[in-house]
Amino acid sequence: MSLVCFPFKEEDVAVVVRNVECAAAHPRVSTVLCVGYSKGETWCAIEAKRPSIESSTGKRIILLQQKRIGVSLRSGKGDGMNTALAYFLDHTELKRIHFYDSDIVSFSADWITKAERQADLDFDVVRHYFPRSSTDAMITWFVTKIGFCLLWPKTVLPFIEQPLGGELLLTRKAAEALYTDHRVRGQSDWGIDTLYTFIMVQKGLHLAEVYIPEGKVHALYSGLRDLRTMLVECFSAMQSLKDEAVPLNEGTHRMEYTRPVPELVKQKVGYDVEKTLKLLRSNWTQGQRDLLQKHFDPALAKGLLNASEWPTWGFADEEAWVAAYRTLLVHFEKGDEDWEELLFKIWVSRVLNHTMRHSLRGYDAALDALRSLIWETQHQSAMLSKSAAANHHIVSGHSASEALPRTAGQLREKRMDAACAV
């Protein structure tokens, strides 16, 4: 039998309770574990409903406050998920653990069933993926997937559809592989999804991805400022791994086919554009200006400084972002306020550029642009690593980080699209 875990903070109580009831009623589930960040209103609501849910389903509903497992980073999502892993590993009668965000309005029993069916085929990890708005998942596309393309282009990492997704199933083998790794236990913040995904592949686990056609309907953020901490922590997690090697041709990766995207998803805007436009004009310091001038492409530096005076985003195209990403991998310093704000501003510029150039042309055009960016970046990085391998003694497993300083120093010829240089 399986355990289903819902990590939570303060959420819509009715949604959380409904999801707990749904999971508890599933025939493959024996225990529902609710891991709370704190004992607030949501905790009290689950506690009040627990007796009736247990009585009606015959299943155990466990409430557990997340423990401080990582000690060097901010306590957040990572501590919550790792608290659940520790509980699962201590209860050997449980064979699989599912994770689902507690605020998902569209959650249903089918999510559990689809994951269980793939695990029955001896996959160690089953991840859920969804149709997403063309302006949603901007950290996934521009931070995680690009990082995987640049650093490990010949592995399956660039091709995992939603590597930051919090909806997944782990077998006991996979849970042990993750929790016994000190890097996982130390990643107490938003970077935990990056670590889970990376280590699953590094350790050769067998991975399946199942498609949820109705999408993940949950609370959206208002402006991109709300995502600043997540952005910094996800990028920092990627940077911490840049010298790691990943064996090639180990493990398997299978994906379920997609379905037509619902119109509601196609029409949704993932963030407040008007609020976001103001972000490039605020919180500037001389330190940020100095870092920008010292380390980055002059075209990007000029464009971002112009954006501090008036709305402009044409400078932050795909080439500019990839070049900036390489520089950030080498020089970014987590905890330095100027570096963190500069990372945020460059990323905001990229998101606005994508929105105005591609999303306004329609959903299909926007998704095609995102997928093309990943495909081209992966291919170019793979060719670069192939060239480097011919002159390097490491021939099995690699990290591309040794090429970063050289590439970061190369200046590209800027091709400005006049239509988007507003």
UniProtKB/Swiss-Prot annotation:
Optimum temperature is 50 degrees Celsius. Optimum pH is 8.0. It catalyses: (R)-glycerate + GDP-alpha-D-mannose = (2R)-2-O-(alpha-D-mannosyl)-glycerate + GDP + H(+); GDP-alpha-D-glucose + (R)-glycerate = (2R)-2-O-(alpha-D-glucopyranosyl)-glycerate + GDP + H(+). SUPFAM superfamilies: Nucleotide-diphospho-sugar transferases. Gene3D superfamilies: Spore Coat Polysaccharide Biosynthesis Protein SpsA, Chain A. Belongs to the glycosyltransferase 78 family. GDP-alpha-D-mannose binds at P7, F8, K9, E10, E11, Q66, K77, D101, S102, L164, D193, Y221. The keyword Glycosyltransferase applies. Activity is not dependent on divalent cations, but it is enhanced by Mg(2+). One of its GO terms (biological process) is mannosylglycerate biosynthetic process. GO terms for molecular function: mannosylglycerate synthase activity. The keyword Transferase applies. Involved in the biosynthesis of the compatible solute alpha-D-mannosyl-glycerate (MG). Catalyzes the condensation of GDP-alpha-D-mannose (GDP-Man) with D-glycerate to produce alpha-D-mannosyl-glycerate. Can also use GDP-alpha-D-glucose (GDP-Glc) as sugar donor to produce alpha-D-glucopyranosyl-glycerate (GG). (R)-glycerate binds at R132, A137, M138, I139, T140. Keywords: Glycosyltransferase, Transferase. The lineage of its organism: Eukaryota, Viridiplantae, Streptophyta, Embryophyta, Tracheophyta. InterPro entries: MGS_C, MGS_GT, Nucleotide-diphossugar_trans. Its EC number is 2.4.1.269. Pfam families: MGS_C (PF21967), MGS_GT (PF21969). This is Mannosylglycerate synthase.
